[in-house]
Amino acid sequence: MTAATASFRHRSRLAPLLEAWSGLTAFLDVGVGAVLDLAIRFWLAKIFFVSGMLKIVNWDVTIFLYANEHPVPGIDAATAALIGTGIELLCPIFLVFGIGTRFAAIPMFLTAAFLQFSYKELTDHALWMVLLTFLILRGPGALSLDYFIAKHLERSAIPFSRSLY
């Protein structure tokens, strides 16, 4: 038996294992990965939405905090509070449904970064920034409206339409 024949037989024995591994990783990416993406989106949406609701309920306190605790340079406290609250109430809705997820995650990331670097350095904010970066770079996953819409845009004339989800 030559070395080439032995090598071929060795590779042919590995082929089923490699195919099984490829199938497993594809399943994990589409199946488990999609559920994990959905869980991340829901978890972040809950955190930001609850924060926005608390700001509305205590609007005077919210304006006080934006004026004294974490002022935004160049913007008065009421305007900054309105922008911040708007981000915390609107963007999570987009995350939950998985529509425009990348675009919705950007202002949420900027909000978390602002709080991390100007107010208090908390591990929670850092974790949120990591997960939001994940959503910005990877997209919302297969369990999202973005994914289902993009499947119908494969032959669209819209540039980069396939990469939107």
Label for each model-derived stretch:
Residues M1-D60, G74-G86, L90, F97-Y165:
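Extended, low-polarity transmembrane helix blocks
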